[in-house]
Regions:
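Active-site loop-to-helix "anion-binding N-cap" substructures in soluble metabolic enzymes
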Residues: 16-17, 47, 172, 191
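C-terminal helix-to-coil terminal segments
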Residues: 160-206
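Single conserved hydrophobic/aromatic residue that forms the stacking wall/gate
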Residues: 1-7, 11
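Rossmann-like adenosine-cofactor binding region
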Residues: 75-172
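Hydrophobic alpha-helical segments within soluble ligand-binding/sensing domains
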Residues: 12-22
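Glycine-rich phosphate/diphosphate-binding loop of Rossmann-like nucleotide-binding domains
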Residues: 20-102, 108-110
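Short, well-ordered alpha-helix to beta-strand connector turns
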Residues: 7, 96-97, 178
Length: 206
């Protein structure tokens, strides 16, 4: 884990869960909604490019992945058949999407001085029921956790109250809905971490 990459999270919380749910990664369209400059947006883009999936980063201008990384992923996509799109219109981005993925808007010890500007910029990219309704009817919601979906935690309450919101990056009704696979996603961390440990620490041919 670092600011720019979250490789293990992509292995465990994302692609394994998607494959379990849909049976395959083929033809899956994943939309990353929010700040796509950092570890989850970057790593999901790399993973989707390698897996031949359809990836869309939906973000405000200035919140997209680094151009050099995008170019590297486009080169990979040319070999795997993946597609990469970068849109600023949430409604257009999620049309027919199979997976809607988001992450918290401020993290990794970022100073409070960035909160107001960041939240104002990303507020239109909140994942809510209206947005999910524009995706494929069988779409799933994913989040690497923790999520600020209500005011029941100290930090969630602080941020929502401070900025006059009931939820931040995802609403509680979506987080708790049948479309949400966030806890299945979290469970899969254990299994893929064990696989990585077996591959790197044990004398086992996988």
């Amino acid at each position: 884990l670092c600011d720019r990459r979250q490789r293990q999270m992509c292995i465990r919380d994302s692609f394994l869960t998607i494959r379990e749910h849909f049976g395959s990664l083929k033809n899956i369209h994943l939309v990353y909604m929010g700040d796509a400059r950092f570890n989850m947006g970057n790593s999901l883009m790399v993973g989707c490019a390698k897996m031949g999936m359809h990836f869309t980063a939906c973000a405000p201008e200035g919140y997209f992945p680094d151009a050099q990384l995008v170019a590297a992923c486009q080169a990979i996509a040319a070999q795997t058949g993946a597609t990469l799109d970068f849109l600023s219109d949430p409604a257009a981005a999620v049309q027919g999407a199979n997976v809607i993925y988001t992450d918290i808007w401020v993290s990794m010890g970022e100073p409070e001085s960035v909160w107001a500007e960041r939240i104002a910029a990303l507020a239109p990219y909140q994942v809510n029921a209206a947005l999910m309704a524009k995706a494929d009817p069988n779409a799933i919601f994913m989040h690497c956790l923790p999520a600020y979906h209500d005011k029941k935690t100290a930090i969630g309450n602080e941020m929502c109250t401070r900025f006059g919101r009931e939820a931040m990056e995802v609403t509680d009704d979506v987080f708790e809905s049948a479309q949400s696979v966030v806890f299945q996603e979290a469970e899969n961390r254990m299994h893929t971490i064990k696989a990585v440990m077996a591959a790197t620490l044990a004398e086992i041919e996988l």
